[in-house]
Amino acid sequence: MRKFVAIVLLLLCGSCALAQRSYILADGDKKDADYQKGKSQQVGLDLGLTVLANRIPIENMMAGSKPSKHLLREGPLHLQLPMDDNQTDFAVYHSEVFDRKSSINILQIDNELIVYRTMETTGNIHLLYQCTRGAYGTKKSAHAKNAPVYRLWDTPERCLLPDLELQDQMAKSEAKKCGKTDYPLLIFNDLKSYGYGEQGDEAIAHFLDTMQKYNPGKRLQADLLTPASQTYLSQVNENQLWNESMRTKIVETLSEQQDYYRTKGMPWMIGNFQIHLADKYRKATTLEELEWFLSKAAAFDAGFGLDFSAATMRQHGLTDTLLGTIKLWEQLRMNGAFSEEQKEAFKDPYGNWHIEQADSSYLIYPQYVSRRYPCHFEDDSWIWDSPYAGPFALRIAVEGKGSISGLSLRTPNGTITFPCTLKAGQYLIYDFDGSAWITDLNFNKLEEVIAQGAAVLNEGETEVTFSCEVQKEKGVLPRVTLRYITKGDWAEKNPH
């Protein structure tokens, strides 16, 4: 039987002073951000403000009927043939500017903007089709052969980028706004876009210098480390969003990233984790998912960004539990309480861990979280294969339409029944201590259930049978899934 249980004493040690504090990403609305701030302070996290100071909405790019002279452009390219004012297909000579993906596909010829829909490359010619002439209020015009053609820089948000002169003005304005806030951390994603012009890395440094000038004492974070930016940045977060489906892929790359930033002497953040509500695409974030991520942050001794909106905080039934768990893991990480052996164990991409406080020490033990088992309502039987023997927790979800009642789960070691009705859009949550609750799909408690009987699982394979009564709605059966959780042995509490 695999056993790994640890007792960790919380030791305050000065050698860990360089550990980076994690943070919650602030909402744009001030009222919501203030709500987040209160929650973040309770658990010892910073509140970070994401700053995008070089985005120009398309509706703001015009100077009368002419494009602004301060838009960032690539080129020039040149027209292969003359073009009249109604022509919607035309050709330009080859240029590497078309190697960059674009979200809007805007070209500028003199004072006319043209949006092309498709492009085909033949030899040294780019053929542009289904073009909108006189786009965004500009005037359609005829253009001569070899007329210069420019491609405007755009972003995935369908915004345009400024030239260096306008970027400096925008940076100064945004820096002054940030200086009036009390956010301790300013976050710059897509930092490379500040250096797309001819100035390159120097433009990035100039931008960060402006932000620092008006925000002394605040930490600056970006998603990219460059020679010029290193002087200004307090930490780097490459903005990788973690989720359960990417377990192995993400963890495999972390050691290389950690080594790279260590050689640069730059504190490194492990990425971002989103706590979200249930929707038609995803189930609400669980405690087990969060602790899996927290164990990886502990494994690499790295802080992280937490995408936990005020709306989600207000509606998620486990908000206080999730924040309290973050506080425990982060206290231990920040104070260097995890041993190297524990960190190596945490790096297992499939490993799940749970932490609880016990007086002045903390108990950490491994968990096994099963896949979801679909029910077919014909005395469903499965072989559950758990690395740990003993009690187990259950998560039974009902979705779609209809309901189930008279739930019963039988193992060779006993039977547990749940005298309740579980409707579509609800969970039955059964925990290790025998407590059971009906919740909504965001884990808000609706009704307590008194479970009857007891059962345990073997180490290794156990045959399990689940049965219930099914109530259709408009002839449609509900969709029911089960997931079980087991845990390793507790360690004896350290008497010191």
Region spans (language model):
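Intrinsically disordered, low-complexity segments enriched in serine, threonine, and glycine
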Residues: V92-H94, T118, R133-K145, W382-H496
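Chitinase-like catalytic core of GlcNAc-active glycosidases
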Residues: R151-K180, E198-H206, Y214-P216
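Autoprocessing Asn-cyclization modules and mimics
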Residues: L49, A53-R133, G137-K140
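Short conserved beta-strand and strand-loop elements enriched in small hydrophobics
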Residues: S103-N111, V149, L409, E463-S467
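Aromatic-lined carbohydrate-binding surfaces of glycoside hydrolases
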Residues: Q20, K31, Y35-H78, A135, ...
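Sec-dependent N-terminal signal peptides
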Residues: F4-C13
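Carbohydrate-binding surfaces of carbohydrate-active enzymes
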Residues: V43, L72-P76, K296, F300-I396
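Glycan-recognition surfaces
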Residues: S22-D34, E59-E74, T155-Q169, Q212-M313
